[in-house]
């Protein structure tokens, strides 16, 4: 019986924390030429940065620096695939953001440089004041189209933190 008391009381004093640190991505990442988002609004630059960072953080992609891009095609007809093979790009992404009174629309086209073909060209809609979430959905679509695995940039994590004996329930968007 005494053993049972200790067995029930000891877990109250134990504390464990799980920390996952990603220090390296893929040894052979997909090389992507991300043409900066077209658009007039401030949402355009924000969306470009979010999508770029989401893809980099997966560890599966290498995004070419904007200064190393050799052309800025505005549509499928402007793409010269041999140019993109010169810099060893695997994929080319053309993107745009359209801001209107009814909301925001992001369009993106993914081109496989080796196969010289378009592999996806969807539109994603969202509310004007939530460019971040819309951008995460775009990132997920790009990730899934290239890897075949569902993206996780728009997922949510629920966690409980404790400080000064007060529990706080938090929901975060990643």
What is each of the regions a protein language model found here?
Residues 2-9:
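Sec-dependent signal peptide recognition
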Residues 9-16:
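Hydrophobic h-region of N-terminal signal peptides that target proteins for export
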Residues 18, 52, 76-141:
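Amphipathic beta-strand/beta-sheet edge segments enriched in Tyr/Trp
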Residues 21-82, 93:
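Short beta-strand->alpha-helix linker/helix-N-cap micro-motif
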Residues 94, 159-160:
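Residue position within the beta-strands of beta-propeller blades
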Residues 99-101, 163-167:
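Short glycine/acidic-enriched loop and turn motifs that connect beta-strands
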Residues 143-153:
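Structural signature of eukaryotic scaffold interfaces centered on beta-propeller domains
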Residues 172-174:
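Conserved small/polar residues in nucleotide/adenosyl-binding loops
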């Amino acid at each position: 019986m005494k053993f049972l008391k200790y067995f029930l009381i000891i877990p109250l004093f134990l504390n464990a924390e799980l920390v996952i640190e990603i220090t390296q991505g893929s040894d052979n990442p997909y090389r992507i030429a991300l043409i900066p988002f077209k658009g007039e609004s401030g949402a355009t630059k924000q969306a470009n940065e979010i999508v770029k960072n989401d893809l980099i953080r997966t560890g599966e992609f290498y995004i070419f620096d904007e200064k190393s891009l050799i052309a800025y095609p505005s549509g499928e007809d402007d793409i010269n695939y041999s140019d993109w093979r010169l810099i060893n790009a695997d994929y080319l992404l053309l993107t745009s953001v359209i801001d209107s009174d009814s909301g925001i629309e992001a369009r993106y086209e993914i081109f496989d440089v080796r196969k010289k073909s378009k592999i996806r060209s969807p539109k994603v809609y969202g509310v004007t004041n939530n460019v971040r979430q819309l951008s995460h959905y775009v990132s997920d679509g790009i990730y899934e189209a290239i890897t075949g695995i569902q993206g996780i940039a728009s997922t949510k994590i629920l966690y409980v933190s404790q400080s000064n004996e007060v529990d706080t329930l938090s929901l975060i968007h990643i």
